Amino acid sequence: MGFTADQEALVNSSWESFKQNLPGYSVFFYTTILEKAPAAKGMFSFLKDSAGVQDSPQLQAHAEKVFGMVRDSAVQLRATGEVVLGDATLGSIHIQKGVVDPHFVVVKEALLKTIKEAVGDKWSEELSTSWEVAYDGLASAIKKAMS
């Protein structure tokens, strides 16, 4: 069974909830990543020289890009059943930063935790699954571009 219209709608509506507090959820997202993988701090240019996760335009822009790409992946999965990267350099950037498979798991967990925080009592298993499938599609496309 492919990605459904309901799943796409769930991702889109929760994406809007995320964007309503982009500064707060961006900090939450990167704080969650660094709690699970402190060594990943150096992979992010906007974090590597800071004492901790602090709000900045670069942090917000990167978080919005990550979550936006997952949202776009949901749209692509619904329309075509596959994710095609809009930025051909994503594979080489991830290689350059030293990204390996476990990092994708950490980011996925942080993404889900952030969306759960953003939607509050609207969180459901179906919402979680929708984001997981969309993220997995994006991660797969990035990994393919890395090989």
UniProtKB/Swiss-Prot annotation:
**Listed GO MF terms:** heme binding; metal ion binding; oxygen binding; oxygen carrier activity
**Tissues showing expression:** Root nodules.
Annotated organism of origin: Medicago sativa
Keyword annotations: Cytoplasm, Heme, Iron, Metal-binding, Nitration, Nitrogen fixation, Nodulation, Nucleus, Oxygen transport, Phosphoprotein, Transport
- Domain (Globin) spans 2-147
Q: How does it assemble?
A: Monomer.
Which protein are we looking at?
Leghemoglobin
Localization per record:
Cytoplasm, Cytosol; Nucleus
The record lists heme b as bound by: 45, 65, 94, 97
The entry's family comment says: Belongs to the plant globin family.
